[in-house]
């Protein structure tokens, strides 16, 4: 395979990148691993798709034998969600899935990432499966395949069967997840080639059991939270092993994780190295443990007596090899070099830092590049996907009924420009899933925050294309930033 000279690299990455290379700044590890791309263009066969999750769009919470989930209970608890809103109906995709597949086809999308409702398939969390629940996903998958769209299936996106006593506090829950993963693989791997175990470990552990913002809404002590994190990791590992043992040959297994991504304050050698160190250490309880099959010394030292209790082969299971890593990327953190023991210092965002409609969604387009680069340089995965990226906006219909979400287009165009940089530099980025296909139930924010590129009228469930959908369709057609 051809190795590029620095002069050729300068032509490929432009003036800013060339200046860094000529000045002696360290080149990214991936340079020279892929053919040069035209400006703004992505590799041939780059996979473009959209993403959703079961509880956020399906509705039909009591249909066809589905059991209650923790989010059904939580959302119906007064004061837990915006104006008491629930996912009881949501976007009603359980009944309107063909409409959603049609939207994907109109976009030209080649993949759809969605999650299974665990309690729809196993109403009691384990034991006897619900054939009607499984049949829904088989219909959805067949509809996708018949439309030329590849299904990417996430097994767990926060909606835990309520029947699993103790939830993630119990070591039995990872075991139940392994059984569920095995069943899903046996029944679906004849038509699903890509499975993800869990989505965003920190959200169904810390936000749910430490901060109390998400179901079940608890605020537990550090030792308990660390053990819950460990159980989440163990579920992932058991899920990987179960999928491999029960699926057809060629099935690809990964996860979708939202690590804290540290952007170097200055793009120079020492600050890049500091940001990479921060990425590894600050994600020690989650992605780092998955990729390395161990907890870092720094994490164990910080937690001390509160560190998780590890049994037998737990860490080996947690570190089960993956075919790909999915990264959910939204907002940046920042780091710089420091002379202290860690080698890095974290920078705080000022009050004036820009954000989208969700106050937590700070804007930093370069974060998507650094998420990919840090992941590659630390662990060298076989493949990386951006499994979520998108934003909330204050969408509204104009006098002509159009939804011109120019702010979302701005956000996406800037982030995808930095995604293209990662592709141009040869990192193993294989695809991108925009969050989200349609407006949905945004957890504790209810229906107050809209992330979709299709507007959903939550009274009629009618879908309307936004400007961002037109923009994304054009990008897919060009295979280049539009």
What are these regions (language model features)?
Residues 2-3, 361:
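A structural signal for short, well-ordered beta-strand elements
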Residues 35-78, 124-125, 134-482:
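Active-site region of glycoside hydrolase catalytic domains
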Residues 2, 8-30:
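N-terminal export signals
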């Amino acid at each position: 395979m051809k190795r590029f000279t620095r002069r050729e690299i300068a032509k490929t990455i432009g003036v800013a990148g060339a200046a860094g290379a000529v000045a002696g700044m360290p080149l990214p590890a991936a340079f020279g691993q892929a053919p040069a791309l035209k400006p703004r263009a992505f590799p041939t066969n780059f996979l473009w798709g959209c993403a959703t999750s079961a509880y956020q769009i399906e509705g039909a919470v009591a249909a066809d034998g589905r059991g209650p989930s923790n989010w059904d209970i939580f959302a119906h608890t007064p004061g837990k969600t915006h104006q008491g809103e629930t996912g009881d109906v949501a976007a009603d995709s359980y009944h309107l899935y063909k409409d959603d597949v049609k939207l994907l086809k109109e976009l030209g999308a080649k993949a759809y990432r969605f999650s299974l409702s665990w309690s729809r398939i196993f109403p009691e969390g384990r034991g006897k499966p619900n054939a009607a629940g499984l049949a829904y996903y088989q219909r959805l998958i067949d509809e996708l395949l018949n439309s030329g769209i590849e299904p990417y299936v996430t097994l767990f996106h926060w909606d835990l069967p309520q029947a699993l006593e103790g939830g993630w506090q119990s070591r039995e829950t990872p075991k139940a997840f392994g059984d569920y993963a095995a069943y899903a693989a046996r029944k679906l791997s004849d038509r699903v080639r890509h499975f993800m175990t869990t989505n965003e470990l920190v959200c169904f552990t810390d936000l749910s059991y430490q901060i109390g913002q998400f179901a079940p809404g608890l605020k537990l002590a550090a030792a308990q939270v660390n053990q819950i994190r460990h159980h989440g990791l163990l579920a992932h590992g058991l899920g990987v092993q179960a999928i491999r043992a029960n699926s057809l040959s060629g099935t690809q297994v990964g996860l979708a994780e939202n690590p804290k991504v540290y952007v170097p304050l200055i793009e120079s050698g020492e600050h890049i190295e500091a940001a990479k160190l921060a990425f590894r250490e600050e994600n020690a309880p989650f992605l780092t443990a998955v990729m390395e099959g161990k907890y870092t010394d720094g994490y164990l030292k910080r937690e001390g007596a509160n560190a998780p209790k590890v049994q037998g082969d737990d860490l080996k299971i947690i570190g089960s090899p993956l075919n790909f890593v999915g990264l959910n990327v939204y907002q940046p953190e920042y780091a710089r070099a420091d002379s202290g023991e860690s080698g890095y210092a974290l920078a705080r965002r000022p009050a004036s830092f820009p954000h989208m409609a969700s106050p937590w969604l700070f804007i930093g387009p370069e974060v998507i590049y650094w998420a990919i680069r840090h992941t590659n340089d630390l662990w060298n995965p076989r493949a990386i996907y951006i499994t979520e990226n998108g934003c909330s906006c204050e969408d509204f219909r104009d006098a002509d009924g159009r939804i011109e979400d120019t702010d979302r287009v701005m956000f996406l165009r800037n982030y995808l420009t930095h995604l293209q940089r990662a592709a141009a530099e040869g990192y193993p980025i294989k695809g991108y899933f925009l969050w989200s296909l349609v407006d949905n139930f945004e957890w504790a924010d209810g229906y107050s925050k809209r992330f979709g590129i299709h507007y959903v009228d939550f009274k009629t469930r009618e879908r309307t294309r936004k400007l961002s959908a037109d923009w994304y369709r054009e990008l897919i057609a060009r295979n280049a930033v539009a």
